[in-house]
Amino acid sequence: MTKEQIIEAIKEMSVLELNELVKACEEEFGVSAAAPVAVVGGAAAGAAAEEKSEFDVVLTNAGANKIKVIKAVRELTGLGLKEAKEIVDGAPKTLKEAVAKEEAEDMKAKLAEVGAEVELK
């Protein structure tokens, strides 16, 4: 199997399948997919503490129009219908973790448009 074939296979996976793949790779090779934490000194550490650069996007309430919220969740996460419905029905649920501020704000705005309540943590 070539690298290109592997990449194509990964592109076709859902978020849940990708999560399972990462966990299986971690177990198989005894590694962690977590990003290494760099120690920052002095003023740079204070600046980093002031403004967060990554956020978790949490669906706190689907609101009255669940169908539109499910469609928005599918569009934003790439999940299948069943997985998106489970997240919406089980709110509060984390949609995405460690998302850049701009993307997190965009996701929040799109979900708010369809009546969902979203929190950035």
From Swiss-Prot:
One of its GO terms (molecular function) is mRNA binding. SUPFAM superfamilies: ClpS-like, Ribosomal protein L7/12, oligomerisation (N-terminal) domain. Transmembrane segments: none annotated. Keywords: Ribonucleoprotein, Ribosomal protein. InterPro entries: Ribosomal_bL12, Ribosomal_bL12_C, Ribosomal_bL12_C/ClpS-like, Ribosomal_bL12_oligo, Ribosomal_bL12_oligo_N_sf. One of its GO terms (cellular component) is cytosolic large ribosomal subunit. CDD domains: Ribosomal_L7_L12. It comes from the Bacteria. GO terms for biological process: translation. Pfam families: Ribosomal_L12 (PF00542), Ribosomal_L12_N (PF16320). Homodimer. Part of the ribosomal stalk of the 50S ribosomal subunit. Forms a multimeric L10(L12)X complex, where L10 forms an elongated spine to which 2 to 4 L12 dimers bind in a sequential fashion. Binds GTP-bound translation factors. NCBIfam families: L12. PANTHER family: 39S RIBOSOMAL PROTEIN L12, LARGE RIBOSOMAL SUBUNIT PROTEIN BL12M. HAMAP family: Ribosomal_bL12 (MF_00368). Belongs to the bacterial ribosomal protein bL12 family. Forms part of the ribosomal stalk which helps the ribosome interact with GTP-bound translation factors. Is thus essential for accurate translation. This is Large ribosomal subunit protein bL12. It comes from Clostridium perfringens (strain SM101 / Type A). The gene is rplL.
